Every structure is written in C-alpha cells, then in structure tokens.
C-alpha cells in the first residue's frame, strides 16, 4: 500500500519506490469452472447484500453454469495487509455502496464473513469451506491451483487474471505515474479496474 498522508508527514525525506506489482483475484470453492463476476456483484457479496450463489444477478451472467442455492461464505483477511488494501481499493472503485460504507485500507471493518491470517490462511479457509469466496494474490492462486473468477473490466470483457492482464493494466497506467521523489503524489495512485480491453 502507498504511504498515507500522515506517514509522509512523519518521514518528509522519504522516496517512494514501488518494488512489485501484482493482481488480487476472487478465489472460490464451488463445483463449477469458469465463474464470471462483475465489480458491483463482488461489492454486494462482500457487503452481504448478495447471499446466495444462485442469486439472479450472478446467474444472469453465468447462464451456462448450474450454481447452487447455497449461502455464500465470504472469507477475508484477519490481519492488515497490502492484499486487503488492493482488494478494498478495487471494491471502492467499482461499488459506490462499498466506497460509502467501508472504503479502502490495509484493514477494514468487514460487514460479513470469516477472517483468516495471510494469503495462506485465506486460501486454506476457501479450500476447506464449500461455497466460499475470498481474495488472494494471483501468484498464490496459481501456485496452489485455486479456482478464481473472471471479472468484467471497464470495456465490458470478462478477464481471467493473468500475468498478461496485469501487464496490460500497468502499460495503461505507466505514462501517468509520478516520480519516486514525490511520495505525496503516490498516495492515491492505483491501477485497479484499469481501462483497456485486456486489463
């Protein structure tokens, strides 16, 4: 997560050097492949407004899938993390309800769900809990073989997160990124929900 305004004031000579970039994905435990979700739907799931997997909003974009009429079990981080910052930044970007009620941060007041520590804890909870959904880093999802949903981007395309999709998002954002010696300019930098057909 970028330095906050308060942290910048405490370290006025800091140089902001982003050292890594990656994707955070909605991983799920359902007996189906190829699940599709939208940002607003994810916002409603994590707000507890959509509670069943066969909710009409989910089923309407997954016409070829037989989704269960079971309760959705939300899994989130119990510890503060950059992964949570990225996920809640995304939800704030795509869901006005989430932005107004919860917002973004390394740690937030989750309205629903069960907490687990670290990517490993969240992954273990998802893998051992049928009908669950949570968020983990893409690299972790790939190495552990977790299913993760394709998410609709700004262009209306459903994108399965990948290294190439991450590169596409970064390529769009790169020309407008501030210099490293301007840490205050990085406070609101984000590449979540990036424009572009493949982001």
For the regions a protein language model found, what residue spans apply to each?
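Second-shell loop/turn segments in exported
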Residues: 12-14, 28-33, 71-77, 109-113
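Alpha-helix boundary/capping residues
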Residues: 49, 90-94, 129
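Short amphipathic alpha-helical coupling segments at ligand-binding clamshell hinges
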Residues: 37-41, 83, 178, 199
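Flexible, solvent-exposed loop/hinge segments that line or gate ligand/substrate-binding clefts
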Residues: 1-7, 17-19, 100-199
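Ligand-binding cleft/hinge of the Venus flytrap
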Residues: 58-111
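N-terminal segment of the mature folded domain
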Residues: 1-61, 66-67, 123-127, 133-144, ...
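Ligand-binding clefts/hinges and TM-proximal coupling segments of bilobed small-molecule sensing domains
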Residues: 49-75, 181-199
């Amino acid at each position: 997560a970028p330095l906050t305004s308060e942290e910048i004031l405490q370290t006025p000579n800091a140089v902001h050097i982003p050292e890594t970039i990656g994707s955070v994905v909605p991983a799920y435990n359902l007996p189906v492949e190829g699940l599709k979700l939208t940002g607003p739907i994810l916002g409603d799931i994590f707000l507890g407004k959509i509670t069943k997997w066969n909710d009409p909003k989910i089923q309407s974009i997954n016409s070829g899938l037989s989704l269960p009429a079971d309760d959705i079990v939300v899994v989130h981080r119990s510890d503060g993390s950059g992964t949570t910052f990225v996920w809640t930044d995304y939800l704030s970007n795509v869901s006005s309800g989430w932005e107004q009620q919860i917002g973004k941060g390394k740690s937030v007041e989750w309205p629903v769900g069960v907490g687990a520590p670290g990517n490993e804890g969240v992954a273990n909870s998802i893998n051992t809990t049928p009908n669950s959904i949570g968020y983990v880093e893409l690299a972790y999802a790939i190495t552990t073989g977790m299913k993760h949903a394709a998410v609709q981007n700004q262009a209306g395309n459903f994108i399965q997160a990948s290294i190439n999709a991450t590169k596409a998002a970064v390529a769009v954002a790169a020309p407008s990124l501030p210099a490293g010696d301007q840490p205050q300019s990085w406070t609101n930098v984000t590449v979540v929900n990036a424009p572009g057909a493949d982001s």
